């Protein structure tokens, strides 16, 4: 599923989508298409997508649905927290953003808090923002 929020950052409206997609590849692809449809039904805004996509592929599967309008933020593996091998947790941004920095939080506390390590990105709105 997904949650969509619109917030104002320094007077600029930004859309944020938090997702936790299904374990099934078929359902993940359906969920991704539903999220894209929901976004297309709204006015265009600078948009950040993020969450546990449960997608093991680097660019395939449900990620294809997002690729036309969103760039993946470069991230290291964040799953499983004790021995990260997979990039299941993603951040994707519309062309309105420039990625200044990104990473995976690897503290001892993070390793026991969840089976996923937290991911983060420092983003800057470009001059092309809406």
Predicted regions and their residues:
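Active-site regions of metal-assisted phosphoester/phosphodiester hydrolases
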Residues: 1-130
């Amino acid at each position: 599923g997904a949650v969509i929020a619109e917030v104002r950052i320094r007077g600029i409206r930004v859309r944020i989508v938090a997702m936790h997609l299904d374990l099934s590849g078929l359902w993940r692809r359906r969920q991704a298409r539903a999220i894209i449809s929901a976004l297309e039904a709204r006015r265009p805004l600078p948009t950040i997508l993020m969450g546990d996509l449960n997608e093991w592929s680097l660019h395939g599967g449900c990620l294809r649905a997002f690729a036309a309008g969103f760039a993946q933020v470069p991230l290291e593996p964040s799953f499983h927290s004790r021995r990260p091998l997979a990039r299941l947790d993603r951040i994707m941004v519309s062309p309105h953003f420039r990625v200044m920095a990104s990473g995976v939080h690897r503290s001892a506390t993070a390793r026991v808090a969840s089976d996923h390590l937290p991911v983060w990105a420092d983003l800057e709105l470009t001059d092309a923002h809406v």
